[in-house]
Swiss-Prot record:
Protein name listed in UniProt: Cytochrome c oxidase subunit 3
SUPFAM superfamilies: Cytochrome c oxidase subunit III-like
Mitochondrial intermembrane face residues: 35-40, 106-128, 184-190, 257-261
GO molecular function: cytochrome-c oxidase activity
Organism, as annotated: Ceratotherium simum (White rhinoceros)
Amino acid sequence: MTHQTHAYHMVNPSPWPLTGALSALLMTSGLAMWFHYNSMLLLTLGLMTNLLTMYQWWRDIVRESTFQGHHTLVVQKGLRYGMILFIISEVFFFSGFFWAFYHSSLAPTPELGGCWPPTGIHPLNPMEVPLLNTSVLLASGVSITWAHHSLMEGNRKHMLQALFITISLGVYFTLLQASEYYEAPFTISDGIYGSTFFVATGFHGLHVIIGSTFLIVCFLRQLKFHFTSNHHFGFEAAAWYWHFVDVVWLFLYVSIYWWGS
């Protein structure tokens, strides 16, 4: 690395992809164990492994980018392309859930009563908690944009304030979603309606939690003066991801909550 004559970052061997894959296996197996055998041991182990992996992987990336200067303009360009491709893959991921929903709702089978929502299902009122959730996420989209503009202008105080507001709104959204799940008059086992509703909104909720974690890391980094107006890709990637989560929710709200009810 001392005699490097190019702008690319030759990454050192890292154990974190392996421990990350292991934690994913433990969490998915743990979910199955929790659903079928009411045991949370494997799920807890998976979550702990995942959190430790995230902490140490993020620590390495922060060290390489902020303190060692490995994230040159060329490397940042590659990271941008990577994040864009990741978000595109997420678009296709959610497209599958929308496909399942519309496939079932546009031509409901006789087993469902020939109608949508199926006979016996009482859907949630889209003008109550779901509408509040929509306004909360839209407000968070405004505040994350405010944070980005403040960072570009070098206004650290406003950037931290806006980022804190965004994180708070993300946590509030998660709490509202949890209360909605708790009070819902149907479950994930209530046929195709319950399956599509909880899988689509549940995966979106998981993405909100991931996005909130991403923003919390950015907030802690900004407290330590890691970002400048021309070197802040970590925050930029978090903002892109958050806007993606916002847009997915709008489609979910219109499709599943409003039209689907």
